[in-house]
Amino acid sequence: MQNATLISVFVASLVIGITAYAIFVSFGPSARNLRDPFEEHED
């Protein structure tokens, strides 16, 4: 049972880490350098 708990905690922390990194990239300080393709092609 201890092995299953360890794997569950690892997978949960991995998912939380990837989500936190994606939010940081989207809204962090470097987000100003990201281009928006919808703004480039306004009709």
From Swiss-Prot:
Location in or out of the cell: Plastid, Chloroplast thylakoid membrane
Membrane protein topology class: Single-pass membrane protein
Keywords: Chloroplast, Membrane, Plastid, Thylakoid, Transmembrane, Transmembrane helix
Pfam families assigned to the protein according to its UniProt record, in alphabetical order: PsbN
GO CC, any one term: chloroplast thylakoid membrane
Record-level GO BP terms: photosynthesis
Membrane-spanning ranges: 5-25
Main location class: plastid
Keyword Disulfide bond applies: no
Record family assignment: Belongs to the PsbN family.
Role of this protein: May play a role in photosystem I and II biogenesis.
Name of this chain's protein: Protein PsbN
Organism lineage: Eukaryota, Rhodophyta, Bangiophyceae, Cyanidiales, Cyanidiaceae
Gene this chain is encoded by: psbN
